[in-house]
Amino acid sequence: MSTLRLLISDSYDPWFNLAVEECIFRQMPATQRVLFLWRNADTVVIGRAQNPWKECNTRRMEEDNVRLARRSSGGGAVFHDLGNTCFTFMAGKPEYDKTISTSIVLNALNALGVSAEASGRNDLVVKTAEGDRKVSGSAYRETKDRGFHHGTLLLNADLSRLANYLNPDKKKLAAKGITSVRSRVTNLTELLPGITHEQVCEAITKAFFAHYGERVEAEIISPDKTPDLPNFAETFARQSSWEWNFGQAPAFSHLLDERFSWGGVELHFDVEKGHITRAQVFTDSLNPAPLEALAGRLQGCLYRADMLQQECEALLVDFPDQEKELRKLSTWIAGAVR
């Protein structure tokens, strides 16, 4: 029986693909070597320990229907669209070795006519007249008895959108996370005009088979045709949840300030695991009572635009004479934290 397993996803859903990856990684026999090929529609994928409000322009993502997906590996934030090919190599220990999977990808690129090399811990670069350009980035995860290496290859990604979603709004964030480094990148289509996702997948598959001297039939998977993976529904529910994608952010502080016709407002939030642990309000308003009440209501609230807006509008019951001011405040807060 072959020790190899090859899975190719027909789904562009990042939560589905990452849930498949997680399930296979947890449940695979330690003797198995797995290659999983996939790609995501418009998504910002962040590292396990990153703060989405610091890394991403969450407001623009929401406006453009770009999803946020937190992966289980470390590293920085990346933007995925259908111009990216994603790969995941998994193996048990002691056989797991990320240099092997890196060499498989390099061999695949070489077979396609691209001479690339590893750079640093995570990147593959090609040499151009303008200098080295990154075409692939990777991240890794290891447990006691297994490990995986996953990454992306830039085929024909819309590089302008990279900056749209990975450059956050100028919010006053004092975060404990680390802002991702923006690398100089290029698409493989600049070197191989017309190259397709299918061609890249075929090249990686051939290099995978060649390295291990075995072949295996590909398992084509999609939400309508999921592999036999125990607990997949629970894993998908977690992967797609707000609690995982946003709520796992490291602790951070956020200052919002705005001047309205009735006075200036400063809101100071301390946030842990997606919940406001402390809220302070400062204002020169002649009627500070609604804002003081708001500070109390926001303690323990989810740091989510709709929840903050809901708490703000709940004050209308106690302060009906300030309806106009509270509705303006509510709209501003919701927009500021998106």
Swiss-Prot record:
It comes from the Bacteria. Pathway: Protein modification; protein lipoylation via exogenous pathway; protein N(6)-(lipoyl)lysine from lipoate: step 1/2; Protein modification; protein lipoylation via exogenous pathway; protein N(6)-(lipoyl)lysine from lipoate: step 2/2. Pfam families: Lip_prot_lig_C (PF10437), LplA-B_cat (PF21948). Keywords: ATP-binding, Cytoplasm, Ligase, Nucleotide-binding. Residues 29-216 form the BPL/LPL catalytic domain. The keyword Transferase does not apply. The keyword Magnesium does not apply. It is an enzyme of class 6 (ligase). (R)-lipoate binds at residue 134. It is found in: Cytoplasm. ATP binds at residues 71, 76-79, 134. One of its GO terms (cellular component) is cytosol. Its EC number is 6.3.1.20. It catalyses: L-lysyl-[lipoyl-carrier protein] + (R)-lipoate + ATP = N(6)-[(R)-lipoyl]-L-lysyl-[lipoyl-carrier protein] + AMP + diphosphate + H(+). GO terms for biological process: protein modification process. Belongs to the LplA family. Monomer. In the transfer reaction, the free carboxyl group of lipoic acid is attached via an amide linkage to the epsilon-amino group of a specific lysine residue of lipoyl domains of lipoate-dependent enzymes. This is Lipoate-protein ligase A. The lineage of its organism: Bacteria, Pseudomonadati, Pseudomonadota, Gammaproteobacteria, Enterobacterales.
